[in-house]
Amino acid sequence: FIEGTYGGRNHPNQEEERRRFCEEIVRVSDRGGTVLIPAFANGRTQDIVMMLHKYLPELNVHVDGMGKRIAKIYMDHPNVLKEPDLLKSSWRWSKQVSSKSDRKKALDADCIVSTSGMLDGGPSIWYLNRLKEDRRNSIFFTGYQATGSGGRSLLETGKVPIWKQKVP
């Protein structure tokens, strides 16, 4: 079997993209803002947290949503991971949101990694609704935004449905 989702395309250098991504996070943090990273629960959340731990260990990073449970499953099965120790240390380094008060504290973080990656639910909507008024804050998408998703709506119109209302 051959998977060809990204076949036939030239892609930018991954290391260069990681560097640019991290530089932008630092830029937002330096101006007093918070970066919201809506991420898919399986794989993307863990990859983002490991990257931030590796390249920006000085940041205050909070993780919320189903990606936490997926990470626990991965850590319980280190044999399926390329870098199990990096995931484990990255998870200890980041702050796991597990209560309403944790969620409120996360609003002051440098970076929040949270599900749903397409802004169709999950804690990301809660964070977006609270961070959207402060222009120092930013949202960074790291995955595909399907037609009809909240993320695609935000990219195309500058508005996203939050609790059935389109808000800028």
Where are the predicted features?
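Acidic/His-rich, metal-assisted hydrolase cores and their charged scaffolds
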Residues: 1-168
